[in-house]
From Swiss-Prot:
InterPro entries: AB_hydrolase_fold (IPR029058), BD-FAE-like_dom (IPR049492), GDXG_lipolytic_enzyme (IPR050300), KFase_ver/fungi-typ (IPR027519). Pathway: Amino-acid degradation; L-tryptophan degradation via kynurenine pathway; L-kynurenine from L-tryptophan: step 2/2. Pfam families: BD-FAE. A motif (HGGXW) lies at residues 84-88. SUPFAM superfamilies: alpha/beta-Hydrolases. It comes from Salmo salar. Residues 1-14 have a biased composition (Basic and acidic residues). Homodimer. GO terms for molecular function: arylformamidase activity. The main chain amide nitrogen atoms of the second glycine and its adjacent residue in the HGGXW motif define the oxyanion hole, and stabilize the oxyanion that forms during the nucleophilic attack by the catalytic serine during substrate cleavage. This is Kynurenine formamidase. Transmembrane segments: none annotated.
Length: 294
């Protein structure tokens, strides 16, 4: 039995309010600090890398990519697609280039994906957009040596949905070598009755078809060659931690999948991803090792 079904609305909302669980500062301050850290990191990245900003991947106004390109003559150039968090209703690609700071030095291309957050976009739209963004990246950058995904929070959900795509409906089948799913939500049912769903307006049917936890058989078909890292913060809420643990167990018990769980000490929902600006950070090192760039 899922614990969340026994919770009253207040407790459920608290469980799915990551800012309430940081040990570093108040809820309001941790969000302000998070946005500042992402913006400052992205500004640094734009100063270090060659950038191609607002590259279209579709017809929509919000369907744009920011590309951070290393100065390298190497033919071994991996590419990481980053999908931002913000509960499908905040943030944008404009503050999502921070992880390029350590990666471009190592000859890695970083692509930050824009998608139409709620209320403009709904869950089906966002999932379709990020899938199409991957197809577009492969078509534009066919020379890369490997394709990797990294997503945080809502972005980890979207990355997991990409891994669970039936690519027969698309013009190409991406060979995704690795994916970092950081503090994500993989079962959308618990958030249906919370404040998170107010702008999203998901029905149970929409939540089910967009829950990676329901799509593990499709992920096995599409992404069996992908190294998957499910990362969770020590100070994520118990329900956020359970989301990662349950999704990891579902993948780990599926024959033929390569998955590890990283329980990152001394982190909360926000600095677990902010620290990817640092080349010495544990998850940065893991990502570089996965790409053969450590």
């Amino acid at each position: 039995m899922s614990r969340w079904k026994d919770m009253n609305k207040d407790e459920l909302e608290r469980q799915f309010s990551p800012s309430q669980w940081s040990h570093r500062m108040s809820a309001d301050d941790v969000i302000k600090s998070h946005v500042t850290a992402l913006k400052e990191g992205t500004e640094r990245a734009r100063g270090l890398a060659q950038t191609l900003l607002n590259v279209p991947y579709g017809e929509g106004e919000g369907e744009k990519l920011d590309v951070y390109v290393p100065t390298t003559t190497s033919l071994d150039v991996p590419l990481v697609i980053y999908l931002h968090g913000g509960y499908w209703q905040f943030l944008s690609k404009e503050e999502s280039g921070f992880m390029a700071v350590p990666l471009v030095h190592k000859g890695v291309v970083v692509v930050a994906v824009g998608y139409d957050i709620a209320p403009k976009g709904n869950m089906d739209v966002m999932v379709s957009q990020v899938r199409r963004s991957v197809v577009s990246v492969i078509q534009q950058y066919s020379h890369i040596s490997g394709l990797y995904l990294c997503g945080h929070s809502a972005g980890a959900h979207l990355a997991a949905m990409i891994l669970s795509t039936d690519w027969s409906q698309y013009s190409v089948t991406p060979q995704i070598k690795g994916a970092f799913l950081v503090s994500g939500i993989y079962d959308l049912l618990p958030i249906l009755s919370t404040y998170v769903n107010e702008p999203l307006k998901m029905t149970e049917e929409v939540a089910l078809r967009n829950s990676p936890s329901q799509l593990v058989p499709q992920l096995k078909l599409s992404s069996s060659n992908c190294d998957i890292v499910v990362a969770v913060a020590q100070n994520d809420s118990p329900e956020f931690r359970k989301q990662s643990e349950d999704y990891y167990k579902a993948l780990e018990s599926t024959e033929g999948l390569k998955v590890t769980l990283e329980d990152v000490p001394n982190t909360d929902h926000f600095n677990i991803i902010e620290q990817l600006v640092d080349g010495d950070y544990h998850l940065t090192q893991l990502l570089l090792k996965m790409m053969g760039k450590s």
